[in-house]
């Protein structure tokens, strides 16, 4: 119950970054669902939203929030989404909900990426959470062998999951990711991989982290 309260608190806290006339990218997941609830209270002020998944689209429609296709807008003012892990460099593992490809596209299209999470998602080193990879179905066995060779991790097929794009998910276990940018590039270069759930090249600009002490705002340092 306390964990759910932390998710709700940070979801609603992200509303402070919403301004009139914005086009907002909306992620996927239980924490993002709380942001959608909050967004419903200001739906008359914003231009509309672009959704990262059918799951979020269903909830947004139920709230009466205007939806756009990404192809019909020039870009996004902000993108708000949760995460499975986030490190001090604002790099993330995402994709537990199997929406990683569309999430990554929206993050890239946004002027500002706001990550919302509770403190349990903060880690020193990425990799304890299995790293999701979206793969075209005909290539998953070959891609899995390549992943063993290139990463040393253990890829497992996520049973019963088909992405909104019609693909499958491989989750890589037993990773200790010390160079997330390099690993993201290596995995994305494997033929058959649609994308990997490492958000390192396009990391978060702001992280809102909820704990028993309240909401902490962390901004990405520009090096």
UniProtKB/Swiss-Prot annotation:
Coiled coil: none annotated. Its EC number is 5.3.1.6. It comes from the Bacteria. Keywords: Isomerase. Substrate binds at residues 28-31, 81-84, 94-97, 121. Pathway: Carbohydrate degradation; pentose phosphate pathway; D-ribose 5-phosphate from D-ribulose 5-phosphate (non-oxidative stage): step 1/1. It catalyses: aldehydo-D-ribose 5-phosphate = D-ribulose 5-phosphate. GO terms for biological process: D-ribose metabolic process; pentose-phosphate shunt, non-oxidative branch. GO terms for molecular function: ribose-5-phosphate isomerase activity. The keyword Isomerase applies. One of its GO terms (cellular component) is cytosol. The active site is at 103 (proton acceptor). Homodimer. Catalyzes the reversible conversion of ribose-5-phosphate to ribulose 5-phosphate. Belongs to the ribose 5-phosphate isomerase family. PANTHER family: RIBOSE-5-PHOSPHATE ISOMERASE. This is Ribose-5-phosphate isomerase A.
